[in-house]
Amino acid sequence: MPVTLSFGNHQNYTLNESRLAHLLSADKEKAIHMGGWDKVQDHFRAEKKDHALEVLHSIIHGQGRGEPGEMEVNVEDINKIYAFKRLQHLACPAHQDLFTIKMDASQTQFLLMVGDTVISQSNIKDILNISDDAVIESMSREERQLFLQICEVIGSKMTWHPELLQESISTLRKEVTGNAQIKTAVYEMMRPAEAPDHPLVEWQDSLTADEKSMLACINAGNFEPTTQFCKIGYQEVQGEVAFSMMHPCISYLLHSYSPFSEFKPTNSGFLKKLNQDYNDYHAKKMFIDVILEKLYLTHERSLHIGKDGCSRNILLT
């Protein structure tokens, strides 16, 4: 169905699903291309459609990346998520709810939909810039929402600050993890009663060797109090504390993601290690949670634990 957008001097400009699909492309020529009959009609319009499409494309995709960097990037699918959300925000209020993102039955594609029509797709492995044989753990609805929110912020940063792709990838990550909305969303899901700036609690070693060995599986096989709990969430419900681990794809996006094509094998290796921790935790969750609760209660109801004033047991660094 046609969707009404509002931007610039072109109030209430109506586009169909096909045109919206074209506008998701960063390729300006493809996005604003008009067929022969469309061009004839445009000749008689007071408000030229070709100009409106150019303006709209610039609003969504910026002015391009400028000079290409030394390394090729794989950002089409993650930027498409941002472009789709940008279109949704430009739609009139009555039409914004028509824009939805769903996962397909195979859990490998995000379907970008307007009404009941799929206008485009984003492959989750291309979004993450990982190899085709990499494993993606299934996500809950809440995890998918957070995942897409992070994708939107990454896409926004790369669209409007293309210079970030010329700098160290850590600069891009800091822009994302430092985003106030992302911090709020991550903590609301993982540690709703704890603020991102919650002060650390000094480590009190009360664990046996066996307990430390059991906890090693949630930290790449190591036990180190200052980093052990950086992926662990917790919240109290009716006096009981429940623990969880951040989904590996979310951890990866926040702390390991690189858009450079040549980094695909490295990216896949990072995700594989995160998957291993995630699966090991859930395989031994009954036993691990008992130890976590013991530490939680003896450290002021927090796992933001440190030693000598130093800690990385926060969700976002």
Curated annotation (Swiss-Prot):
GO terms for cellular component: extracellular region; host cell cytosol; host cell membrane; host cell plasma membrane; membrane. GO terms for biological process: protein secretion by the type III secretion system. InterPro entries: SopD. Pfam families: SopD. The keyword Methyltransferase does not apply. Gene3D superfamilies: Secreted effector protein SifA (3.30.2440.10). Keywords: Host cell membrane, Host cytoplasm, Host membrane, Membrane, Secreted, Virulence. Disruption phenotype: Deletion of this gene impairs bacterial replication in mouse macrophages but not in human epithelial cells. It is found in: Secreted; Host cytoplasm; Host cell membrane. Disulfide bonds: none annotated. Effector proteins function to alter host cell physiology and promote bacterial survival in host tissues. Contributes to replication in macrophages. Plays a role, cooperatively with SopB, in membrane fission and macropinosome formation during invasion. Belongs to the SopD family. This is Secreted effector protein SopD. The lineage of its organism: Bacteria, Pseudomonadati, Pseudomonadota, Gammaproteobacteria, Enterobacterales.
